[in-house]
């Protein structure tokens, strides 16, 4: 009985997340209410509050779902024991771009995060959440780059902090550009070239050296 109740709770949580995704994609995060999500999910607002305190937590759940399929590659590149951290980063980026193009749900969630998540005054929690997510990502990239330097895969004088900012900006900008104008960039056909462009920047740019 306890197991069944737990499974039902997990199913309800998944329903709510799916409904939030649909509502956010259609109306934007700021214009969507928890009542809208409850109606789409076929649950009460109380059921939503059982699982999520606010919209910020629902946005975080969508963000977390993007990381599930490639989290192991991120962790590997950040580990000092990984012998090929730059290779792990390359695989991760290939996976990120391929999923963006080929998986409809991944594309919708990215649309929400990049183009439908307005930072209005009453959305300060979501702004803070996104700031925290960017800083966490920066920390992970910096660790991966430092590991690649130690393994001789990147120049010894690479400024890992500055390079991490540049790499995030490159990837984030390419995703935003493709979402806005998908026909202007062959992200799938040229995926290896796009990834290697970013990695070549790390290897070759004098401006990223200390």
UniProtKB/Swiss-Prot annotation:
Signal sequence, renumbered to the chain: none
UniProt keywords, alphabetically: DNA-binding, Repressor, Transcription, Transcription regulation
Disulfide links within the chain: none
One term of GO molecular function: transcription cis-regulatory region binding
Keyword DNA-binding applies: yes
Induction comment: Induced 4- to 8-fold in the presence of toluene; this is controlled by TtgX, a possible efflux pump global regulator. Induced by chloramphenicol and probably by tetracycline.
Entry GO terms, CC: protein-DNA complex
InterPro entries the record matches: DNA-bd_HTH_TetR-type_CS, Homeodomain-like_sf, HTH-type_TetR-like_transc_reg, HTH_TetR, Tet_transcr_reg_TetR-rel_C_sf, Tscrpt_reg_MAATS_C
Top-rank taxon, per record: Bacteria
Gene3D superfamilies per the UniProt record, alphabetical: Tetracycline Repressor, domain 2
Domain HTH tetR-type: 10-70
Function: Represses expression from the ttgABC operon promoter and its own expression. Binds to a promoter region between the divergently transcribed ttgR and ttgABC genes/operons; in the presence of chloramphenicol or tetracycline this binding no longer occurs and ttgR and ttgABC are derepressed. This suggests that TtgR binds these antibiotics.
Name assigned to this protein: HTH-type transcriptional regulator TtgR
Organism from which the protein derives: Pseudomonas putida (strain DOT-T1E)
Source organism phylogeny: Bacteria, Pseudomonadati, Pseudomonadota, Gammaproteobacteria, Pseudomonadales
Gene name as annotated: ttgR
